[in-house]
């Protein structure tokens, strides 16, 4: 169960980061202030919820195990940027993602 909470905390944290990125995207039409406030508001909600879930995780897991699991954020952000904004991801970056996933698997099996 705590693994699900940890993944959800990670996804909400990433959601907050992606909302911040979206807030900075240029608009083709007016409404810049509304656009900015919407995405920054969503970012705050996501980040706040992530923090609450993170506190639940820290009550259960040792910080030495829990904190490295947040490396998943790098994986989620890379995948989202690639799919949502069609950002180029070089092979070296994909190798880093694979290494992060390997590290998470190794650390997760020790928990």
Curated annotation (Swiss-Prot):
Name of the protein in question: Probable 4-amino-4-deoxy-L-arabinose-phosphoundecaprenol flippase subunit ArnE
Membrane protein topology class: Multi-pass membrane protein
One Pfam family in the UniProt entry: EamA
UniProt KW keywords: Cell inner membrane, Cell membrane, Lipid A biosynthesis, Lipid biosynthesis, Lipid metabolism, Lipopolysaccharide biosynthesis, Membrane, Transmembrane, Transmembrane helix, Transport
GO CC list: plasma membrane
UniProt-listed InterPro entries: EamA_dom, Flippase_ArnE, Small_drug/metabolite_transptr
Organism of provenance: Salmonella paratyphi B (strain ATCC BAA-1250 / SPB7)
Domain EamA residue range list: 40-109
Gene that specifies this protein: arnE
Lipid biosynthesis in keyword set: yes
Compartments where found: Cell inner membrane
One example of a Gene Ontology biological process annotation: lipopolysaccharide biosynthetic process
């Amino acid at each position: 169960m705590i693994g699900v909470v940890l993944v959800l905390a990670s996804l909400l944290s990433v959601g907050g980061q992606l909302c911040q990125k979206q807030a900075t995207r240029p608009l083709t039409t007016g409404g810049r202030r509304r656009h900015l406030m919407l995405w920054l508001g969503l970012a705050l909600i996501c980040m706040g919820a992530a923090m609450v879930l993170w506190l639940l995780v820290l009550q259960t897991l040792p910080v030495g195990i829990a904190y490295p699991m947040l490396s998943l954020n790098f994986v989620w952000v890379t995948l989202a940027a690639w799919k949502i904004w069609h950002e180029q991801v070089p092979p070296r970056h994909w190798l880093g993602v694979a290494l992060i996933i390997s590290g998470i698997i190794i650390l997760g099996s020790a928990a």
